[in-house]
């Protein structure tokens, strides 16, 4: 995503290029930004997963700018010297021909430690909290299911009119989608609890019981998500 107006400051969010196709797409976009007289203020990363960070070596061949992100995200980029640490309530301001655009940082660390969203008048840059199709993985390795559900509720409380998500198309009028996500995760949480109470004692058996309504689910992912709920 690119924040800001044509001819003003621009912030590039999650460029995440890792191959030639991505390189060419970003290169074309940056050329378009520069052609309209804009300056690139910074690169903002919503979280530290590689599908959002991309290859910094490739990115730096196209443009150089300070990197902004949470402490956890910046710790994954030790080679970057010019940085700004973002945390809850911080304001990202980009100046443009018609005025200043402000985006408030909101922490939603459930999917990944240090994940942030950016809340502005056009909507919310919502990182990996939800998507139009399917569900979002909350890795048992470093995710936090309770924090993830709380983050969804936090997003819903804003009553945003658009979510700009990390995967798939933007979500217009997202209250319904957020409610579905919250209800789905809470229901799955209860099914995991029921599996334990019924006597299931291995992760495999808990996952089979908790995901009995989706027999086609990938067994490894089902076990990982069951562990996250546990």
Where are these regions (language model features)?
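Active-site HxH/HxHxD metal-binding segment of metal-dependent hydrolases
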Residues: 17-101
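Core dinuclear metal-dependent hydrolase active-site scaffold
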Residues: 2, 91-119
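C-terminal regulatory/interaction regions
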Residues: 194-230
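Conserved beta-strand hairpin/beta-sheet module of binuclear metal-dependent hydrolase folds
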Residues: 1-32, 117-129
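Divalent-metal (often Zn2+) His-rich catalytic cores of metallo-beta-lactamase-fold enzymes
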Residues: 145-199
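Active-site environment of divalent metal-dependent phosphoester hydrolases
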Residues: 19-20, 48-54, 74-77, 112-115, ...
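Surface-exposed cleft-lining segments at the edges of enzyme active sites
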Residues: 134-142
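Active-site neighborhood of phospho(di)ester-bond hydrolases with catalytic His/Asp-centered motifs
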Residues: 13-15, 39-49, 67-71, 107-110, ...
């Amino acid at each position: 995503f690119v924040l800001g107006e044509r001819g003003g400051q621009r912030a590039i969010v999650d460029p995440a290029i890792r191959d030639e196709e991505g390189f060419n797409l970003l290169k074309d976009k940056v050329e378009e930004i520069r052609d309209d007289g804009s300056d690139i203020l910074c690169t903002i990363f919503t979280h530290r997963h590689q599908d959002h960070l991309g290859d910094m070596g490739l990115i730096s061949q196209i443009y150089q700018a300070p990197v902004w992100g949470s402490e956890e995200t910046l710790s994954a980029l030790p080679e970057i010297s010019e940085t700004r640490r973002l945390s809850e309530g911080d304001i990202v301001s980009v100046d443009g021909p018609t005025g200043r655009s402000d985006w408030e940082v909101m922490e939603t660390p459930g999917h990944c430690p240090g994940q942030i969203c950016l809340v502005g008048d056009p909507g919310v840059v919502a990182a990996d909290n939800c998507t139009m199709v399917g569900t979002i993985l909350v890795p048992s390795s470093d995710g936090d299911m309770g924090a993830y559900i709380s983050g969804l509720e936090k997003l819903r409380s804003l009553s945003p009119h658009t979510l700009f998500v990390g995967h798939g198309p933007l979500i217009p009028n997202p209250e319904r989608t957020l409610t579905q996500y919250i209800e789905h995760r809470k229901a799955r949480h209860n099914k995991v609890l029921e599996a334990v109470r019924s006597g299931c004692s291995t992760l495999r058996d808990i996952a089979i019981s908790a995901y009995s309504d989706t027999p086609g689910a990938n067994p490894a992912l089902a076990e990982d998500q069951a562990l996250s709920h546990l």
